[in-house]
Design a protein with these regions (language model features):
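Membrane-helix interface and helix-disruption motif detector
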Residues: 49-53, 76, 92-101, 120-121, ...
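Alpha-helical transmembrane segments in multi-pass membrane proteins
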Residues: 60-68, 72, 84-118, 127-131, ...
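Structural signature of transmembrane alpha-helix termini at the membrane-water interface
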Residues: 19-23, 70-74, 115-116, 138-141, ...
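Alpha-helical transmembrane segments
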Residues: 9-14, 184-185, 213-232
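N-terminal signal-anchor module of multipass membrane proteins
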Residues: 1-98, 230-243
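Membrane-interface helix-loop-helix junctions at boundaries between adjacent transmembrane segments
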Residues: 1-3, 133-160, 164-221
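Juxtamembrane interface elements at the cytosolic ends of transmembrane helices
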Residues: 193, 201-206, 230-248
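Alpha-helical membrane-embedding segments
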Residues: 72-81, 117-124, 141-146, 166-169, ...
Length: 249
């Protein structure tokens, strides 16, 4: 199947993210930057480029993308348009809220839910990835809350990972498939319950603004190159003549 070769393309994309991190920043700053990213409270708006530099941000994106791909592969979840979209979401938001630390408790919670239900994790692997929309809450409970403790972040993430599979199944019935962002809807409902609870105990998250500027040209050039590679790859490496690939589009 044509989607099987996508693993090679995804790995090449991950490598490109690593290389971008090395190009855009001093390699010596990447590991300290990753530590900053892992320990930030992730309250909106937290731009990883602003707090840790572009190198650490891109390497974090590469690592999160690699972990997400590995989760799908080990769960034997077939690659298709939906799962590739999930990988893209993980990659993009790893510049802005998701990191190599705060996604794991949510994965664990979803895995535990699958074990309790006595069902394969592959059935919920996509839910596990999309549930990391609330990964910033894990970081907040671990590093930013008045009651911050790493164990609190882990417990919060496990709770999120266990609650969202049944909640997303319910919200799908509510909107009857009319909302393409069903997991976003479910995550929003859960956040609407959790944040008021924090506010009630005097722990309301305060908004911040870490927003990087001055990268328009280099990032714009990198984005243009990436889009060009995708277009050329789709036209000439899809196993069909270029005109047929274009006609299919």
């Amino acid at each position: 199947m044509r989607y099987k070769r996508m693993y090679i393309i995804i790995l090449a994309y991950i490598l490109a993210l690593f290389l971008a991190g090395l190009v855009f920043d001093d390699p010596a700053d990447i590991l300290p930057g990753l530590q900053k990213i892992a320990e930030t409270q992730d309250v909106l708006i937290t731009d990883y480029v602003a707090i840790a530099g572009p190198g650490a941000a891109f390497v974090n994106s590469a690592l999160v993308t690699l972990i997400s791909t590995a989760v799908l592969f080990l769960a034997r979840c077939p690659l298709n348009g939906f799962t590739i979209t999930e990988i893209g979401l993980m990659s993009g938001f790893a510049l802005f809220g998701k990191n190599v630390v705060n996604i794991w408790p949510i994965f664990l919670g979803t895995w535990l839910y699958a074990r309790i239900q006595k069902e394969p994790f592959s059935k919920y692997s996509s839910t596990a990835l999309l549930a990391t929309a609330l990964a910033p809450l894990v970081s907040y409970m671990g590093f930013g809350s008045l009651y911050a403790h790493p164990l609190g972040g882990i417990i919060t993430g496990v709770f999120i990972g266990m609650v969202l599979p049944p909640l997303s199944a319910y919200t799908y019935k509510v909107q009857n498939g009319m909302n393409l962002y069903n997991m976003g809807f479910a995550c929003g409902l859960l956040a609407m319950m959790l944040v008021p609870i924090l506010t009630a105990v005097g722990d309301a998250p305060s908004s911040v603004l870490y927003w990087a500027e001055g990268y328009n040209r280099p990032f714009g050039a990198a984005m243009a190159l990436m889009c060009l590679v995708f277009i050329v790859g789709g036209l000439f490496f899809s196993g069909r003549p270029a005109w047929a690939a274009w006609a299919g589009y």
